Swiss-Prot record:
UniProt xrefs under NCBIfam families: prmA
Keyword Translocase applies: no
Organism whose genome encodes this protein: Salmonella typhimurium (strain LT2 / SGSC1412 / ATCC 700720)
Catalytic activity: L-lysyl-[protein] + 3 S-adenosyl-L-methionine = N(6),N(6),N(6)-trimethyl-L-lysyl-[protein] + 3 S-adenosyl-L-homocysteine + 3 H(+)
Gene3D superfamilies registered for this protein in UniProt: Vaccinia Virus protein VP39
UniProt-annotated binding residues for S-adenosyl-L-methionine: T145, G166, D188, N230
Lineage: Bacteria, Pseudomonadati, Pseudomonadota, Gammaproteobacteria, Enterobacterales
Similarity annotation: Belongs to the methyltransferase superfamily. PrmA family.
Function field: Methylates ribosomal protein L11.
Cellular component GO terms held in the UniProt record: cytosol
Protein name: Ribosomal protein L11 methyltransferase
Enzyme Commission number(s) of this protein: 2.1.1.-
GO biological process: methylation
Gene Ontology terms, MF aspect: protein-lysine N-methyltransferase activity
Length: 293
């Protein structure tokens, strides 16, 4: 069926409140997108996180009277009469069927497979993560997710605690648990991502070892042996002071969602507190890893 998309711009601090306003006005789903960076879509919007300049996008049924929606939103104190927005009619397409047909089991590193829950497992003896992320969250198909999964596969995670900052479908946190981590913590600004992560954790039998939080609910003074953040260069730079305190001394950090051309500026934001490894590139994207000093 066709859909109507309403996009408005705000700050990261207000994104969650305006997301609630769009849902109350009738939106069936919400996407957060960095205004300035190229967003990471896997395979549709939904992977981006909390940053300074944010587009909040609401998806509405094609029969929705958008004049009524705008009138409702104009009553919100963060918007007001005549607030800037863009309304767009989306193509009528069976997104779910097309997405499912093109999502196949994928291998990352030596041990790890990501398998759609509706397909057969290629290797019963491998570390298999069964994934049903829905339309809006990570599946492993994007180079940045692949880079993170390969990195996790190469680590000794036995008994470790892992934080997945911007968890989306939970793919990285769940992979870490299946690879031996004792505990994982997923953080995401999008409530739908939290639910998708919870569902996927139950599907993989690791829900008892995965904690999930919206940023406003996360515990203070969280620490982990390994921290991975697959978001975008803009928020990685902006949130460097927050992300940098999460690894313990000697802990590991993995960052992606970064174009190769942006690597230097992201490295600069973390170099003071981390001993950084050589940047690893895949296609036009890259991964930055390091150890806490």
């Amino acid at each position: 069926m066709p859909w109507i998309q309403l996009k408005l711009n705000t700050t990261g601090a207000n994104a969650e409140e305006l997301s609630d306003a769009l849902m109350e006005a009738g939106a069936v789903s919400i996407t957060f997108q960095d205004t300035h960076d190229t967003p990471v879509f896997e395979p549709l919007p939904g992977e981006t996180r909390l940053w300074g300049d944010t587009d909040v996008i609401g998806l509405f049924d094609a029969e929705t009277d958008m004049k009524d929606v705008v009138a409702i939103l104009e009553q919100h104190p963060l918007l007001g009469a005549g607030f800037a927005h863009k309304i767009e009619q989306l193509e009528d397409k069976d997104w779910e069927r097309e997405w499912m047909d093109n999502f196949h089991p994928m291998r990352f590193g030596e041990r790890l497979w990501i398998c759609p829950s509706w397909r057969d497992i290629p290797d019963e003896n491998a570390v298999n993560v069964m994934l049903d992320p829905g339309l809006a969250f990570g599946t492993g198909t994007h180079p940045t997710t692949s880079l993170c999964l390969q990195w996790l596969d190469g680590l000794d995670l036995n008994g470790k605690t892992v934080i997945d900052f911007g968890c989306g479908s939970g793919i990285l946190a769940i992979a870490a648990l299946k690879l031996g981590a004792a505990k994982a913590i997923g953080i995401d600004i999008d409530p739908q991502a939290i639910q998708a992560s919870r569902d996927n954790a139950e599907r993989n039998g690791v829900s008892d070892r995965l904690e999930l939080y919206l940023p406003k609910d996360q515990p203070e003074a969280m620490k982990a042996d390994v921290v991975v953040a697959n978001i975008l260069a803009g928020p990685l730079r902006e949130l460097a002071p927050l992300i940098s305190v999460l690894p313990v001394e000697g802990g590991l950090l993995g960052l992606s969602g970064i174009l190769a051309s942006q690597a230097e500026s992201v490295c600069d934001a973390y170099a003071e507190l981390f001993t950084l490894d050589p940047v690893v590139e895949k296609e036009e994207w890259c991964r930055i890893t390091g150890r806490k000093k």
